[in-house]
Amino acid sequence: MGDEKVMDYKIDQIGIVVKDLDKTAAFLEKLGVGPFPTIETEVPGGKVKIGIFQQGDLQIELIQPLEGDTIHSRWLKEKGEGIHHVSYHCKDIEKELQKLEKLGVKILDRGEIFGVKWAYLDTEPHCGFILELGQWPEG
């Protein structure tokens, strides 16, 4: 690969798994972090409630598992509340995933929500959290 960097993009999101999104958001909003508009959405294996606060180029995403056996519900059960993922924005997720696959990095989960393609990478054993790649729709 030479000098070409893997994931040569900026961090655009920190994802935090929580038991009670409304309670967590209310506390953070008292500290000046927020507001967290919320939605409920399907993810592979179930359903979650998501609240996102945008500050400049960075999003803070609160994720509350609601139904099913999802990567988020398993994380909450096994590790408790806390940082789940750090997301890098990329322009071509398929190209980046191919680079990472050549390095032996496995994909834990992937999908598309509201036009955003995303993939969780199996990095938790190495750094304590999951790295995510996200490709936003153009425009």
Question: What name fits each language-model region?
Answer:
Residues G2, E67-H72:
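Short amphipathic beta-strand starts and helix->beta connectors
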Residues I11-V18, L28, F53, I60-I63, ...:
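Short, structured motif recognition centered on aromatic/hydrophobic residues
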Residues G2-G46, Q55:
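Long, hydrophobic N-terminal alpha-helical segment
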Residues T24, P35-F36, T70-I71, G128-F129:
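Short loop/beta submotifs within extracellular cysteine-rich repeat domains
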Residues G2-K5, V18-A25, K30-G32, G51-Q54, I60-E61, E67, E78-G139, ...:
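Vicinal oxygen chelate
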Residues W75:
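Regulatory and interaction patches adjacent to catalytic/ligand-binding sites
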